């Protein structure tokens, strides 16, 4: 369903599915799928034509150039006055994160979570998927808590992100904008190589090492 919905609206749709017995080809009630985590388009649901207009690459065909992530100023055509929103990127929303209210998300009837991970690293995908899997298991076991949700959110913040917010699901009236052009990850990594193959039977990985050489300073050579 659309990311502009709030939890109350999602629950109403879920209740109607059950009340009206709206079923899929399997004969079982259709499941509600919602975006749960990842980058948000300035158009929220992705119907954006900025990339197509400026670069000839359509976001609606999976080829977005993400020029909305750049820094922009707002100019008044009548007066020519320029307004800069300090510390914010006007067209770049923060990333969606539903971990802090995932229990309410599930209570509203959401049964399939969609994670936005286009052009993200394997590390990003692994971290996000395993974190949400752990949170869902905690909800199922009755051990989900705000304290654990805070720990999971910190874990998610270690990989690529533009800051987090809960989207419109909790009734936010306006979008929260990112304060950075790139990643706001709390942990910096050094790229040392790429795993090119893994031989499962013998437990051996083949790694292409990428070494970056920098000349030592005179102080280092003393």
Provide a role label for each language-model segment.
Residues 34, 115, 216:
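Conserved, mostly hydrophobic/aromatic
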Residues 213, 220-222:
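Single conserved hydrophobic/aromatic residue that forms the stacking wall/gate
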Residues 188-189, 199-201:
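Short flexible coil/turn linkers enriched for glycine and charged/polar residues
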Residues 1-111, 125-128, 135:
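Catalytic alpha/beta core domains of metabolic enzymes, predominantly
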Residues 200, 206-212:
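A structural micro-motif recognizing beta-strand termini
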Residues 111-120:
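Short acidic/histidine-rich active-site segments
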Residues 14, 30, 123-189:
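Anionic-ligand-binding alpha/beta catalytic cores of soluble enzymes and soluble regulatory domains
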